[in-house]
Amino acid sequence: MNYRFTNILKVIIFFCFIFEIQSEEIQKPYKNLEKALLNPADVRNLDLSFLGLKTLTNKIGQLKNLQKLDLGGNEPTILSKEIWQLKDLQKLNLNNNKLTVLPKEIGQLQNLQELSLHSNELVNLPKEIGQFKNLQKLNLDNNKLTVLPKEIGQLQNLQELSLLSNKLISLPTEIEQLKSLKNLDLNHNELTTVSKEVMLLETLENLDLRSNKLKTIPKEIRQLKSLKVLMLTGNQLTSLPKEIEQLQNLKTLNLGENRFQIFPVEILELKNLLELNLYYNQLVEFPKEVGQLKSLKYLSLYHNQITTLPVEVTQLPDLQELHLSGNKITILPKEILQLKNLEWLSLSNNKLNALPKEIGQLKKLQRLELGNNQLTTLPKEIEQLKNLQRLELDSNPISPKEKERIRKLLPKCEIDFEGGGGE
């Protein structure tokens, strides 16, 4: 009985394998239009990317069942009108072309779910873009857009809107109507304020506002209850609104390259925060209350003006990476070495002249950056770091004899005495 059952099982597995291979063959994209036209009714996926095409034959309109079309990396300054007759099209890629205008006929693609237009030369969008009732992803990165049409608000099923590297100075009020939006990327634009309408996007999980000209964040940010990632790097912020502490689902907060002189204490209420970046600011103190962020795994404060570390940092039991390079730290408190889960510790470009022997307690440490300090020796306990893969000690006054001693203490570790790789 077991033998027969085993044979039957083998037969079932065999046919499943054959079926999977056939399915993969059906989904495999055609790379040649002429070959695709031999069996036009069977073609679902056509990839004509990076072929140097400047025109497109009107025969493409024969592919009535086409669902995915990739025309990226060509130079069709005028798109074939037959494309707009492909009513079953779900995914359209027009990246890396030289398009300056998007024809209004594009609105005829009622079944479109993904539209990618990044790296073109578009200065505006036709109002017909609002006709994409099924559109879920819209990528407009690297264009020359200064405004968005108000019809953008009609994209009720849109989940991802990417507008990186454009010239937007504001957003239409209708953007608040995007009730399904989860990801909004406005990185590298010309925004001086965040419109309150953005703060009404209750489903938003990822908001990227890096490299704009923001000086303040509106208190209405408290309404983004679903927000998990907030990127504010490269702006002109000096403070945060108290209301930000209501974002209890926030996992990642990036505030690097701003103008903070005082640690924004509002952050301390974000109990579920996993990653906090405050690099390249003007902070002089590291608040002892940071120990309240019990879930924190990644903390980056490199290139500030911090002189001392509070012992309360040991209250971050899950911390895996601590980046403090480019500060003015003179002493590393032995308590900090109780961070049992620490894997990466960066202390380059400080004023350390010694390490506590407790360094050996960091059993999970894989990378230790100590370049450009005033160290002349390391404690013997460094040999206890069995998982250490890289140690950076460049630009320290360490003698050749001491270097040889350190190498013997860590025979399996890559040790850099010359420089090349720290923050």
Residue ranges and their predicted role:
Residues 338, 343-401:
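Ankyrin-repeat and related helical/solenoid repeat scaffolds used for protein-protein interactions
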Residues 1-67, 395-423:
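N-terminal capping/linker segments that flank leucine-rich repeat
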Residues 40, 62-66, 84-89, 107-111, ...:
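Leucine-rich repeat
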Residues 44-48, 69-71, 89-94, 113-117, ...:
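Conserved hydrophobic beta-strand positions in leucine-rich repeat
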Residues 34, 56-59, 79-82, 102-104, ...:
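The feature encodes a structural signal of leucine-rich repeats
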Residues 3-5, 14-19, 132, 260-263, ...:
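Aromatic (phenylalanine/tyrosine) cluster motif
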Residues 91, 101, 110-114, 134-137, ...:
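Periodic short-repeat tracts
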